[in-house]
Amino acid sequence: MREAGYGAIIDWSETIAKPADAEDFAEKAIFVVIASGFKSATAKPIAERCMLALRAGLSSATEFGHPGKQVAIDRIWAEREEMFAAYEAETDKLRFLISLPWVGPVTRFHLEKNLGGDHAKPDVHMERLARRDKTDTHKLCRRLARETGYRVATIDTVLWRACAEGLLNSKIYEKKGWKAAFHPKRFLASND
C-alpha cells in the first residue's frame, strides 16, 4: 500500500489527533454524517462546501441536498460547544457519540476513529473480511494490530482502503478466500 502511494493515509491512521476544540470536533462529526452512504471522494468536497457555508452563518442546506442530514449538520454546528464539552467529559466516548444526530451504531466507530480513538468501523467490507475468518471486525483488527504493531485504526484503514480501491474484493474474499479476492497486479496497474 505504501508503494502504491498510500503511505500518507497509513501515517495519518497512526497519528490521528484528538479534536483541538469544538469547531474541530464539529467538523469531524459533520464529515462522518455526510460520508455515511457516500464514497469518501464524494463526501470530502461536500463537507468542505458545507463547512464554508456554516462558517459564513448559512445552513448546510445551501450546499447539500439531503434533508435529514442537513438538520443533523446544522444542529451539530449550532451545538458544537455543548457537544464537545459533553464528549470531553464522557468516559464512554462511543456511547456518547451514538447520541449525536445521524450517528448510528456503525458510524460512531468511524467518528471516534476520526476523533483519535483506536477503533475499527464495522462497515460492509470489514464485516465480510471478518466473517470469512469466523470473527467480527473488532476482533479481526485487534488481532492484526497485535501481530503487526500498527494501531487498530490503521489496520481498519488499510483493509478498508484495499477493498475500496479494488486491491481486495471483500465479497469474493468472503466466499472464495484470499487467492480469488486479492488483485495486486490489477490494483498497481490502475495506479500507474
Regions found by a protein language model. Give the residues of each.
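Short alpha-helix boundary/capping elements
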Residues: 34-42, 81, 119, 134, ...
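Alpha-helical ds-nucleic-acid-binding substructure associated with the helix-hairpin-helix region
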Residues: 38-102, 106
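C-terminal accessory module of base-excision DNA glycosylases/AP lyases that mediates lesion recognition
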Residues: 1-16, 70, 74-77, 89-192
